[in-house]
Amino acid sequence: MIKTELESERNTNRKALRAGINVLVALIGLLISAGPALSENASDWITGLPREPIHVQAWPKGKKVAVCFILYVEVWGFGHGPNFRPDTAARDPDVVDESFRQYAIYWGIPRVGRLFNEQALPLSIALNAAFPEEHPDVWQQFRSLVPKAPIIAHGINNSTELLPLGRGLDAQKAYIQRTLDLIEKGTGVRSRGWTSPSVYPNADTFTATAAQGISYSLDAMDSDVLSRLATKSGPLVLIPYPVVAVDMGHYLERSKDPSDMERLWTDYVTELARDAADPDREATVIAIGIHPFVVGTPAGAAALRRVLENLKKQELVWVTDVQAVLDAMGENP
């Protein structure tokens, strides 16, 4: 009698558990399916402005993951910039850290240019406006290696002349205008893309860039897909630039070697490709920030070369540049 009652109670509990699991699975399914719909008319969390995804089913030749490597060509100035050895930063002169920065300019930037030239792969350039004038020989040598690389405006420099945040929209417009004018003077190219110096914009920056003729920005770090921000000055395409894929933070703040970045980049893109292999999923895009301090050393270039060679073999991966992405989605600034 007691045994029968226990078995009956167990059966009842099993049925209740199965019912509960079924309800939970159904709720999860609803949340997953609702995700894209919820994001269709979302407000951007930085600006509060309307932001919507840009739907791309596939890139050219059926590729599903667009990968844009962005080399940051920057001016820091003597006594400024990233420190390889924080324990020597108080020295005057700080020979260790100044050498770290100078090597990146004179040896690292050309080495990265040679690598992409040898691999016959596109590169995009994020350029501080002061660089061509301050380092004309380096700029000319580098540009000759990647003459078709799109130039993305990256402010005046990366230390003493950043965006005038907190001084109003007009001040930012003037700064952006000056940046674009200087880049055009030094390169002959009028940039249509923007990435804020030191990754430090605010809500006004997006409207200010659009007002000055910028059509796309890398200041969005929170997505796998393209999106469009409706600024007060006009639409602005946001190209995903995930913070976890930028080399310098990992290298300096987390003590990761170039070989660690090799594994991270390969895994990141490979997993995006695995996701995108589902025909019901849309195409994705990632802009990967690289710096000559990291990938411009011999060890860094060797690691990056292995990444590029790996990505070239992946059927669904398209290594490209930002302009080609815009062209492919129908945005031709």
Residue ranges of predicted features:
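C-terminal domain-boundary segment and adjacent tail
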Residues: 50-52, 146, 216, 266-333
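Active-site beta->alpha N-cap acidic-glycine motif
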Residues: 42-148, 307-310, 316
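Active-site-adjacent pocket scaffolds in enzyme catalytic domains
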Residues: 41-61, 181-185, 189-281
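Boundary at the C-terminal end of the N-terminal hydrophobic targeting segment
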Residues: 37-39
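N-terminal secretory signal peptides that target proteins for export/translocation
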Residues: 1-18
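Alpha-helix N-cap and loop-to-helix initiation/capping positions
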Residues: 167-174, 256-260, 299, 303
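Metal-dependent polysaccharide deacetylase catalytic core of the NodB/CE4 family, i.e.
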Residues: 91-93, 110-113, 118-202, 234-235, ...
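Bacterial N-terminal signal peptides
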Residues: 22-33
